[in-house]
Amino acid sequence: MKKDFLPIILGSDENAYGTARLFHEAYDVRPLLVCAHQLIATSHSRLFDLSIVKNFDDEDVFPNALDNILRRCQEEYENLLVVPCSDYYTSLLVRHYDRFDGRIANRFISPELLASLDTKDKFYKLCEKHGLDFPKTVVCTPDERERVIDELPFPFPIVVKPENSNAHEYLHCEFEGKQKVYFFSEREAYLTMVRAMNTSGYRGKLIIQEFIEGGDDAMRVMNAYCDVNSRARMLCLGQPILEYYDPATAGNYAAILTRGDDELYTRVRSFLQEIGYVGFANFDMKFDRKTGRYVMFEINPRLGRSSFYVRAAGHNMMRFLVDDVVYDSAPEYVCNKTVALWSNVPMGILRRYVKNKALLREITSLPVTRTLFYRGDLSLKRLVRVGKQFLAQYGGFKKYYFDKETDFPKM
């Protein structure tokens, strides 16, 4: 007799580990984790079986490799649930979904919808159509990168991003000063960066935006799950209280407080339903103190890297997936209103770099949830390796931190 389901997780980062942990906590199952390379976040873990496939993230390798895995696993399991943990795995999965001939039980958005939101400029067109706010934005091609800085319709400071910082092309290009997101207070600093970028062969568009006032605690993040009929079954809002600043992870969230906002939930829920969204989604946005409105930055067609904050509030996102797809028993609709703390950094870093004293009092009064430290998976080898990386973050913040409200870096 076949078992009910097998989760197949694509990736090996913190998001992948958190996803495996969620399946373990909810169903005591052992997922299969498939990746091209194993990262520290998933090292020495007992939670999953591991399959390392050379060049698995390559367009020419991925379809056949995953199909072979699916064919093998379907002999033992009724339902195969595939959860991609990066944008490029999601993109590969969506483009080749029909090739897997129904072997994947869960559904994803269509290639057409993915193409309409996989870069920030396309996403903003959807936002405009559906009544969501977004920042003043200029999009430039590689040939326009240098001259566009003298034609901006808004003043410095500015924020600059690749059209998709998680796209394969940007992840694999190299140049001095490369980051996921850039903050500039002057023209020459911007030109220094783009001239270095122009030597890398990166041919994607650049997104140049007005800086919305506010520090890390003005940011907001929302993770969602929608069923095959585009009904939002789960929404959870978070208030980041600290971001990362080192070049490799700048803009990622280091700590989050879970929140609730009924009006925002209603707007996002309507947006997802109107565009026909299916599966997991992650929104990044910022609260604009001048207008009192939320300004959308981007949507990722998967759970966010820091999505384990949802678990801190008492909700398990994988339970919504499994109960929907396998057991047809998912709750009709859940929106979080619980306040809880998730952190990926030591408390000493929060005490030093969280400037809002009211927030600091709030976070020090709450228990903390951490993705990578799980009582059910703490071998000595894992604890040493993950713990070393965890404590090394003190050095990263000391070297790279700056106050976004008062001290933009001169790069």
Where are these regions (language model features)?
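Peripheral (often C-terminal) accessory segments that flank ATP-dependent C-N-forming ligase machineries
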Residues: D323-M411
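Flexible, glycine/charged-enriched surface loops at secondary-structure junctions
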Residues: I207, F280-N282, P331-C335
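Active-site nucleotide/adenylate-binding loops and adjacent lid/helix of ATP-dependent enzymes
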Residues: S116-I207
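Oxyanion-binding "anion nests"
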Residues: P247-A250, T258-F283
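Phosphate-binding site of ATP-dependent enzymes
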Residues: F184-D246, R259-T266, F287, R293-V295
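Glycine-rich phosphate/pyrophosphate-binding beta-alpha loops
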Residues: L242-Y245, T249-Y253, N300-G314
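ATP-binding N-terminal substructure of ATP-dependent carboxylate-amine bond-forming enzymes
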Residues: M1-I109, D143-R147, F397-F402
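Conserved metal-phosphate-binding beta-hairpin within the catalytic cores
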Residues: L272-F308
